[in-house]
């Protein structure tokens, strides 16, 4: 059996929801307190045992490459000033086996994954979406990517991460139609549906940003016609794969943070900061103070 060694991180999106901040800065470099969102993804991959990572980038994404490259001037400065803890943090982002390829035109997630065909070769691999951060406030939790890799060790089949979402929200996701009940959190899947209307959704089990796929997906993606949004949809290709190979779905029971929109990004930042040793106490005190002020502002005033 071939070991899962490689991961793909699609990072070619334009980040329009975060304009003007993302006009010249990659969305994936926006920080949660003091760490870019893409670094959380890379750390999850490494904790799971992934050995090689390919980041699929686009225009205005050079900052991602710079972040994971050596900065000799900064490292020398930190070393000279004896700032060893900061130097360690900088070193952690450079000692990684990272590769980069550019998606010339954003044609959807399926097309972004297709750019990795030569990198992956004939091996199973993981796709990790940067908008979904998993259990970042729980250091002891088993990484979701690791869970998928363990499933593959048992099934030798593609496995997609899913999570129950409110029924009214299913139109924002790919959704699975499961075959029966889950066995130890693992579903067999009948079909995959991309962004169904709530009345048409086969379940509330939405696909979230972790996929473990067999290399046969690439032949399907090369023939895949554009789907929703006139883009090459990875969900559609997985549904086609499911017709010739079994595809499973792993239900995630941990905490998922969606940093793909402003409010989700803000919630993630607050939750992570409340666990951050350098700021958590000050933030807790501020939130308590702010809560009291907001409650006071709700108290109706009575004029005489």
Curated annotation (Swiss-Prot):
InterPro entries per the UniProt record, alphabetical: GalU_uridylyltTrfase_bac/arc, NTP_transferase_dom, Nucleotide-diphossugar_trans
Enzyme Commission numbers on file: 2.7.7.9
Protein family: Belongs to the UDPGP type 2 family.
Segments crossing the lipid bilayer: none
GO BP term (any one): UDP-alpha-D-glucose metabolic process
Organism: Streptococcus pyogenes serotype M3 (strain ATCC BAA-595 / MGAS315)
Pathway: Carbohydrate metabolism; nucleotide-sugar metabolism
Reaction catalyzed: alpha-D-glucose 1-phosphate + UTP + H(+) = UDP-alpha-D-glucose + diphosphate
Keyword Transferase listed: yes
GO molecular function, one term: UTP:glucose-1-phosphate uridylyltransferase activity
Protein name: UTP--glucose-1-phosphate uridylyltransferase 1
Pfam families cross-referenced by the UniProt entry: NTP_transferase (PF00483)
């Amino acid at each position: 059996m071939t070991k899962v060694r490689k991961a793909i991180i699609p990072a070619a999106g334009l980040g329009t929801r975060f304009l003007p901040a993302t006009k010249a800065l990659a969305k994936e470099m926006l920080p949660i307190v003091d760490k870019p969102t893409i670094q959380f993804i890379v750390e999850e991959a490494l904790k799971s045992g992934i050995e090689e990572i390919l980041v699929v980038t686009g225009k205005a994404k050079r900052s991602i490459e710079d972040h994971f490259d050596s900065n000799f001037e900064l490292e020398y400065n930190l070393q000279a000033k004896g700032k060893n803890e900061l130097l360690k943090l900088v070193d952690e982002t450079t000692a990684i086996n990272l590769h980069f390829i550019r998606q010339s035109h954003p044609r959807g997630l399926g097309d972004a994954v297709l750019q990795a065909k030569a990198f992956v070769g004939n091996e199973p691999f993981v796709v990790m979406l940067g908008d979904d951060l998993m259990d970042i406030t729980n250091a002891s939790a088993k990484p979701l990517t690791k869970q998928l890799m363990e499933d593959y060790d048992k099934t030798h089949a593609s496995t997609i991460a899913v999570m129950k979402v409110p029924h009214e929200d299913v139109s924002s996701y790919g959704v699975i139609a499961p075959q029966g009940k889950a066995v130890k959190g693992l579903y067999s899947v009948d079909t995959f549906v991309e962004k169904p209307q709530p009345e048409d959704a086969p379940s509330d089990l939405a696909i979230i940003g972790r996929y473990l796929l067999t290399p046969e997906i690439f032949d399907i993606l090369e023939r895949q016609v554009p789907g929703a949004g006139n883009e090459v949809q990875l969900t559609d290709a997985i549904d086609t794969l499911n017709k010739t190979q079994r595809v499973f779905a792993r239900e995630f029971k941990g905490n998922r943070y969606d940093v793909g929109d402003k409010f989700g990004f803000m919630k993630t930042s607050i939750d992570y900061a409340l666990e951050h040793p350098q700021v958590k106490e000050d933030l807790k005190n501020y939130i308590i103070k702010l809560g009291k002020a907001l409650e006071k502002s709700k108290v109706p005033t009575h004029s005489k």
